[in-house]
Amino acid sequence: MSGRPDTPAVALADRSSDAIPVPEPLSEMLPHKGLARGTVTRLSGVNSVLIAVIATVTQNGGQVGIVGLPRLGLLSAAQMGADLSRIATVPSPGTDPVEVAAVLLDGMDLVVLGTRGVDVAPSRSRVVMGRARKQSSALLVVGGTWPGAQTTIDTEVLTYRHLPAGDDLREARSGFGRIGGMRLRITVSGRSQRAETSEADLLVPGPGPVRPVTLVRAGQARPQLAVAN
C-alpha cells in the first residue's frame, strides 16, 4: 500500500468509468460494466467466479485485499493469470473481519470479505459503505449477507465438461478424461436493475502448452468440449 490512506495504492488502467474491471460474462450484466467504485456487491456460489474477478482486477493494475477466506486458492488465481504481487491476504482476521476489511478499503481497489457467519448490523454496514465511497474502492462480500448491498451476484454449476478430444487427447471419449471445465449460470440483481441471468463457460486447458484457465461467455468454448456422462 502507498501509505496515503485517502488514495488508492495503484490506479487502474482506466478510471474514467469509475468501475473496476471484471470478466466479460459479468461485465455484460453489470450496470457499470464492472464493479462500481464506492459500492458493495454480494457474491454467492462458485469460487471460480470470485477467482476470475480477482485475476481480472490484478491483470488491469488493481490491488486486491482478501479477508477471511483461508481456503481460497491463490494457485487457481495464478492459473487464471492473476498478478499475485497485487494481492494482500488476511486469512485469519480474528473476531472482527469487517473491521479488517474496512481498513483495507483505504489502500485497495477491491476488498473481498468472507464474513464467516458474522451478522453485520445495518448501521455498521452504512459506515463501511461510506468508507468505500470515500476511498473510491469496492467491497465484495462472499457467502454472506450485507444490508444495503447495491448488487447481488449468484452463481451455480450447470454441467461439468471433460477435456476436448483433439491434438492433445486423441483418445478422449465422452465421459472420460480429466474435467475440462464447467458451464455456469450467473444471475445478477440489484437495487437499480431487474434480475438478469446468463450462462458462462469456465475452460480448463488440457495437456500441452501452458494456457490460462478462462471464464468466457457460453458458446465460445471449442465444439469438442462435450458434457460428461
Which residues make up each language-model segment?
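Hydrophobic/aromatic beta-strand patches that form the interior of the parallel beta-sheet core
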Residues: 41, 65, 88-90, 140, ...
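Structural beta-strand/beta-sheet cores of well-ordered domains, especially the beta-sheet scaffolds
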Residues: 39, 109, 182-184
